[in-house]
Amino acid sequence: MKHKLIYFQLLLLVIAFHANGQKKGLSDEQLLKGARTNITQPLPQVAGWIDDSHLLLNKKVNPDSPSRVVVLDCKTGKESPGSMDMLKKSTAPSRNIIIKEDDLYLKEGDQPEIRLTQTPDKEINPTRSPDNKYVAFTRKNDLYTINLDTKKETRITSDGSELILNGYASWVYFEEILGRATRYKSFWWSPDSKSIAFMRMDDTKVPVFPIFNENGQHGSLENTRYPKPGDPNPEVKIGMASPESNQVVWADFDASTDQYFGMPYWKPDGKALWVQWMNRGQDNLKVYEVNLSNGSKKEIYDEKQKTWIDLDDQGGRITFLEKSSGFILQSDKDGWENIYLHNLDGTLKNKITNGNFWSNTVVKIDEKNQLVYFTARKENSTRTDFYVASLDGKKIQRLSFGDYTHRVDLSPGGSYFVTIYSNSSTPERLALMDQKGKLVKELGDAKGPEFDQYEMARTEILRVKSEDGLYDLPIRITWPLNYDKSKKYPVMINIYGGPNAGTVRDGWQFSGQQQWWAKEGLIQVAMDHRASGHFGKNGINYMHRSLGQWELKDWITIVKWLRANGADSARIGISGFSYGGYMTCMALTAGADYFTHGLAGGSVVDWKLYDSHYTERFMDTPAENPDGYKTGAVLTYVDKYKGLLRIYHGTMDDNVHMQNSIQLIKRLQENKKHFEFMVYPGGRHGWGGNQSMHSTNENNMFIYKNLLQKEMPKAMLR
């Protein structure tokens, strides 16, 4: 009997071994060409909420099947046929503005298009008023409106030129303050559609930076008004007007003052404009209420910090309470992002949250029940959770669950929410939850039927203690397929690195490219430093007046850990673009004892060469912080360079000028250093098409030649 038992146990081991050994390997076509696998499958798509208890979902039985729209009754959990028309909020004919051949057309319901403009000049950023009666736009840097009922055009400003921009942002405001999503638009309708606010920017004193265009027999120069650290900035005025008047009321600010203005806020009734003001040093933020009739202002809020305050909040700093007199404000002044309740006159009522919250987004304010719903990173800095707090600050509850990153969609009345949740080892799932965070129904799982049938590399989130012992630095690491602890492997680290710009997130990420590199034996790493946002503003403040220093110190600590855990110290690669390119260059120079190979794209190499607003926020001006600019410059450490750096840049980059790479190349040549360099003619701060494929191929060949030390397979070519 004993012998039979031993035989049976051995038989089970053999069966288990063979079953485990029968896992399939992903083919080249699946990894590199997007050929079908059933490792994952589509989740139902949330089309929207019909009302507080009915959700519209777009579902597929399998990837090849047609979509079907269903209505989910959240109270019963039952589904019934639905249609996208159920999301329509109004029966009135829709009014859409169409741009054709640089002119504007009105498309109203099923009616033929009506031409609104016919000029040789472009109409830019057409934006309808909230009541759908007007469209505002800019033309040749002046602000216009058209009454969509009468088709009457009104020119609100008349001094637009190459230097005077009305309703159209100067470059530094577009890039650093208002944001790229605005597409240079700097005008805003009031909620009642009775007024329009705009910024007037005067670029007269802003220095010109010439960008060379190689096209044509003689080439040409594109002259950009681009302020560098210490340079004059655009002079900005805030104007307000009614949509059919050219009588502009100017807010009571002195445009010649060294200052910045952030995204303005209209009060919910449209009767006043709140303007964010900041000093040139970016350590004092004030919010003013501006009177629409005479432009007078009164101070509502005043915040000072020893380091800096971020102005580019994209409209998320202030949220008004519409049914009561007050607003909530988000600030990191106590070292973390917390939420505060204020009266409309600016006086503080109470602090709503008091904890280590970061990356907060207000989802909804429920004034009836005196609640605010928001997402934030708190339980774990690599994950996003969903919370509800009472406006009086006495109660707070986490509504999401588990060790997952959550993306939520709250019902209009706050009775239910759906969440898409995942982590680095769990594909996304979709669930319906009630207002107390209790599971109502699982709605979908992206884990496919063949998930367990394929060999896949292991990805995990780990923490490495900083050298000073103060921080547990997060890394996301994908190990080589069939990783063997007794062997040494090459490493490729992908980074960005800027202040509050972390990249390590604990969510499901699966790509054929990632699995390909793992199959080839490459350790793939994303890593964040103490100032990347995982440790609040207290951690970020380390970078004040010292860009490039703490990032490198913490990353060297992580590289030491990698060396002790399977990394080949002679093949430590790092790659990044923009700020990531800067840190790649720093790693190959100041960190040359630890980083051996680098791919640096669109890189800053000296902070004196970047723009005023971004650089001075962290570094102050070169005159105020000469030592910080010196220690933060790649050029300072070129003599330490000893690995292999591949530099690449777009010739018409209007963000990080190619001047940066040229100055680095010059210094490398002066020091007789070997490096690689590639330019992309006409490329801006990024490029597409064949240039993008060429760039990818060249970078992949660099990895094969220097890290994997073998020829790149033809299957990798794009």
Label every model-predicted segment:
Residues 36-41, 123-125, 163-182, 256-261, ...:
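Short glycine-/Asp-/Thr-/Trp-enriched loop segments that recur within the blades
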Residues 1-27:
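Bacterial Sec-dependent N-terminal signal peptides
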